[in-house]
A protein has these predicted regions:
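N-terminal secretory/targeting leader peptides
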Residues: 1-88, 108-109, 113-300
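A gly/proline- and charged-residue-enriched helix-loop-helix capping module
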Residues: 86-107
């Protein structure tokens, strides 16, 4: 009899992440049986609950945007410093060269989790129901959905928005009830969450380049046979390559799909990004004062 692995996520069928988890499961289907809850928010659960569910071995494998780990792993906020990285490849290089090892050790030592890898969660952009975002005045008095991250809340308040922290579960409801004026997400989430139906101004700000942590319960993993562990690690590595490719393909086609929904799109200029960078620079400085070992800037 094959061992059963319980897997869970927080996005729908069309999501890059859901399709990537499908790929991972298929790679291992000859060795393991799987119970897969694709979107726990449909069951009324918060996306953030995936962390405790995996740590406690209620499920064995999950993915989740790294920001949700900030209270348990505050150094992860390096990936959440707005306008800090110039492009996604810069972040990927940092992860591969330095950050992966650090995060992996922290998860194993402190959280009973084993890191299977980082997934591409997309460049994050800002949409509103009023106008494009190009200076502080364009942010003024807009109620923007942020994650429950204290850093995110403070950053958007600083820019002039009114931060409304919501888990993915509650964000979907706030959208349908028209209770927010703005939000920030990668293009794939903008589309799959249906933001294009109510927010017709999309600013390509690339203020963050997001990544998900793809993890397995450490106790569960350690009890597996060596061959089973090898198969999971091999499948995880192949899934990361597949997921990165899928994410790039998704982004390239989504712009036209979004435009076809009568959404106006504006790309933030370098000068505008630099002006916003000056505004949020204190958050960068505070982070590196608190976590000086996270200043990998010289080696990026």
């Amino acid at each position: 009899m094959k061992k059963v692995i319980k897997v869970a996520g927080y996005q729908g069928e069309a999501s890059v992440h859901t399709r990537s988890m499908d790929f991972f499961i298929n790679e291992l289907s000859k060795t393991f049986d799987f119970e897969y809850e694709k979107d726990i928010t449909l069951l009324g659960k918060k996306a953030s609950s995936l962390i405790d569910m995996t740590r406690n071995n209620d499920i064995q494998i999950s993915y989740l945007w790294s920001s949700y780990y900030e209270k348990l792993l505050p150094e992860i906020q390096l990936l959440d410093l707005p306008f800090y990285f110039k492009n996604k490849n810069e972040v990927k290089t940092l992860i591969d060269d330095k950050f992966n090892k650090f995060v992996s050790e922290k998860l194993e030592d402190d959280l009973n989790l084993k890191l299977l890898g980082f997934w591409d969660n997309g460049a994050r952009h800002i949409s509103t129901n009023r106008s494009f975002i190009n200076d502080e005045s364009s942010c003024s008095d807009l109620k923007i959905r942020t994650t429950p991250s204290e850093l995110h809340i403070n950053i958007f308040n600083k820019l002039g928005f009114i931060s409304c922290p919501l888990d993915v579960r509650d964000f979907k409801k706030a959208l349908s009830d028209d209770k927010i004026d703005a939000q920030e997400n990668p293009l794939t989430n903008f589309w799959n969450f249906g933001v294009q139906k109510s927010q017709k101004f999309l600013t390509l700000s690339s203020h963050l380049f997001g990544f998900c942590l793809f993890v397995v319960n450490q106790d569960f993993f350690n009890k597996l046979k060596d061959k089973e562990q090898e198969l999971i690690l091999k499948a995880a590595k192949e899934t990361i390559s597949y997921q990165y490719k899928l994410a790039e393909e998704d982004d390239s086609k989504l712009i036209d799909m979004i435009k076809n929904e009568n959404v106006q799109i504006y790309e933030m200029t370098i000068n505008e990004k630099n002006n916003f960078l000056k505004k949020v620079k204190p958050f960068h400085n505070n982070f590196f004062l608190q976590f000086p070992k996270m200043n990998f800037n010289e080696v990026i």
